[in-house]
């Protein structure tokens, strides 16, 4: 019985807070019940002067433990039981509008249900302000605290009901009602269709969340308002994720898609995405990217499991911030088609462009200086390419994927790189290929052997394609010099004059 004391005191205080009930030490079940207080543990231990039975009579106490509930609950409940026709409970209730002709037969109540229903009636009459859910919780807690002797009357009542139920419905078999599955099926179908089309906003927000600025602000991305029609079920509550969470997993949670095995995020298929829709979001939010720290989220070899020839698609998918920012929709495919069959005019020897350039010593210049004169990166690009003519085309693909950290530099240096960069497909992320710091600065990121080890067998490919890069062809891949975001008029100047245009479009402050 003493088990109950702390709980009774707790419910007391609750009750004082809720109703200011006049009887402070009686539990909510009996306070206000008209019965004389039986020798329940609470009143017994705290207010002995109110008890009808003296505290020192163990026989009476034992008898009351078996027959009475603490704090007069038993008496209150028995009053309810007397006045309540329990045979009504299991009787068939006709289901309106149901296709079945058979009425639904409820299960017989178990002991807890008997207790809860009776006590709820009593308490609801006494404390109409009590919230039903709170009442249920309290009744459940009290039931768990009762000992066997206290539960016995309810167990017996439940047994009686069960026997009665069996007489009334001899062939009764419990069949839980099936939930109507129509809505669930529709919802699943909708989710399936939603997952096939990924809205550009969702992609951009997923990318933005990888930026270090929003690592603590990732909760903004998952906040319910920002789920752009993709979350299944209730939106994820905003949480501040652990810093060591894998970015792939975070993206997937944010985009509401199930995580495949291994936790790796599959590359987004951009055929379904209108790249033009991205640009406004990207331009307005481009300041939030911390260019230099962005590399830490990258796998060492670009996207695992993606063939290198898909570099353009993958690149715009995962880091398409800069390249898609200023492009009209579909530009990427135009560039790809041009590149796939490059006309091979061999007028110029392979080494011709690098000849007048500066020596490659500035290669070790820190990449954090986006304001370096554009002529330098041009020199780096050329010397890198010409001094390693035996290396493969893949080299530069991988380099591009390895460091998408050049968002700010790209706008300033892209013209020079464009002149010599279109070696193969992946460089045509729309409107200008972003080969920037990672090419002339590859020594900062990894030793160069890792770049060239995976593509040793294709030396001639680089060498031959390099011949196509004569000045006559350069205008085909002109950078964006105007601010409209459309590829501008071909510029036939020599590379030295390409520094003039001022690229104010997306540079960070």
Curated annotation (Swiss-Prot):
Homodimer; homodimerization is required for activity. Interacts (via C-terminus) with ZNF219; forming a complex that binds to the COL2A1 promoter and activates COL2A1 expression. Interacts with DDRGK1. Interacts with EP300/p300. Interacts with beta-catenin (CTNNB1); inhibiting CTNNB1 activity by competing with the binding sites of TCF/LEF within CTNNB1. Its main location: nucleus. PANTHER family: SOX100B, TRANSCRIPTION FACTOR SOX-9. The modification Phosphoserine is found at residues 64, 211. The transactivation domains TAM and TAC (for transactivation domain in the middle and at the C-terminus, respectively) are required to contact transcriptional coactivators and basal transcriptional machinery components and thereby induce gene transactivation. GO terms for biological process: cartilage condensation; cartilage development; cell fate specification; cellular response to BMP stimulus; cellular response to epidermal growth factor stimulus; cellular response to heparin; cellular response to mechanical stimulus; chondrocyte differentiation. Residues 224-307 are annotated as: Transactivation domain (TAM). A motif (9aaTAD 1) lies at residues 275-284. This is Transcription factor SOX-9. Residues 63-103 are annotated as: PQA. Residues 56-67, 160-174 have a biased composition (Basic and acidic residues). It comes from Callithrix jacchus. Residues 105-173 bind DNA. Residues 63-103 are annotated as: Dimerization (DIM). Pfam families: HMG_box, Sox_N. GO terms for molecular function: chromatin binding; cis-regulatory region sequence-specific DNA binding; DNA binding; DNA-binding transcription activator activity, RNA polymerase II-specific; DNA-binding transcription factor activity, RNA polymerase II-specific; RNA polymerase II cis-regulatory region sequence-specific DNA binding; sequence-specific DNA binding. Acetylated; acetylation impairs nuclear localization and ability to transactivate expression of target genes. Deacetylated by SIRT1. There is a cross-link at residue 398 (Glycyl lysine isopeptide (Lys-Gly) (interchain with G-Cter in ubiquitin)). It is found in: Nucleus.
């Amino acid at each position: 019985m003493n088990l109950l004391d702390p709980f009774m005191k707790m419910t007391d205080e609750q009750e004082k807070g809720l109703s200011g009930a006049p009887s402070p030490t009686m539990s909510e079940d009996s306070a206000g019940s008209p019965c004389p207080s039986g020798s329940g543990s609470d009143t017994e231990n705290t207010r002995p002067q109110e008890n009808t039975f003296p505290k020192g009579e163990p026989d009476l106490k034992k008898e009351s433990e078996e027959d009475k509930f603490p704090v007069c609950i038993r008496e209150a409940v028995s009053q309810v039981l007397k006045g309540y026709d329990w045979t009504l409970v299991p009787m068939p209730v006709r289901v309106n509008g149901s296709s079945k002709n058979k009425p639904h037969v409820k299960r017989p109540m178990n002991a807890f249900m008997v207790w809860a229903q009776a006590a709820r009636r009593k308490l609801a009459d006494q404390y109409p302000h009590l919230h039903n859910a709170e009442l249920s919780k309290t009744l459940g807690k009290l039931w768990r605290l009762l000992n066997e002797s206290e539960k016995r009357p309810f167990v017996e009542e439940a047994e009686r009901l069960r026997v009665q139920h069996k007489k009334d419905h001899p062939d009764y078999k419990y069949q839980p009602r099936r939930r109507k599955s129509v809505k669930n099926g529709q919802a699943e179908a909708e989710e399936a269709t939603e997952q096939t089309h990924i809205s550009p906003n969702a992609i951009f927000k997923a990318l933005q969340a990888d930026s270090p600025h929003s690592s603590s602000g990732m909760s903004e991305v998952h906040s319910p308002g920002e789920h752009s029609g993709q979350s299944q079920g209730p939106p994820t509550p905003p949480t501040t994720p652990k810093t060591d969470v894998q970015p792939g997993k975070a993206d997937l949670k944010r985009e509401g898609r199930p995580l495949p095995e291994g936790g790796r995020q599959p590359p987004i298929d951009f055929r379904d995405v209108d790249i033009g829709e991205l640009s406004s979001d990207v331009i307005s939010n481009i300041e939030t990217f911390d260019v230099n720290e962005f590399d830490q989220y990258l796998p060492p070899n670009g996207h695992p499991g993606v063939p290198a020839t898909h570099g353009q698609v993958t690149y715009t998918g995962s880091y398409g911030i800069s390249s898609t920012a200023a492009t009209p929709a579909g530009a990427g495919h135009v560039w790809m088609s041009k590149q796939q069959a490059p006309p091979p005019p061999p007028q110029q020897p392979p080494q011709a462009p690098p000849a007048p350039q500066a020596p490659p010593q500035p290669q070790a210049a820190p990449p954090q200086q986006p304001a370096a004169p554009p002529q330098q990166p041009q020199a780096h690009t050329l010397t890198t390419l010409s001094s390693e003519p035996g290396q493969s085309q893949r080299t530069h693909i991988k380099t591009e994927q390895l460091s998408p950290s050049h968002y700010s530099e790209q706008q300033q240096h892209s013209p020079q790189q464009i002149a010599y960069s279109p070696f193969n497909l992946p460089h045509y992320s729309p409107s200008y290929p972003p080969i920037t710091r990672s090419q002339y600065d590859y020594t900062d990121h990894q030793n160069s052997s890792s770049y060239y080890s995976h593509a040793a067998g294709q030396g001639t490919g680089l060498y031959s394609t390099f011949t196509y890069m004569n000045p006559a062809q350069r205008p085909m891949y002109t950078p964006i010099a105007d601010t409209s975001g459309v590829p501008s008029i071909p510029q036939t100047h020599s590379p030295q004059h390409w520094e003039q245009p001022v690229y104010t479009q997306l540079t960070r402050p």
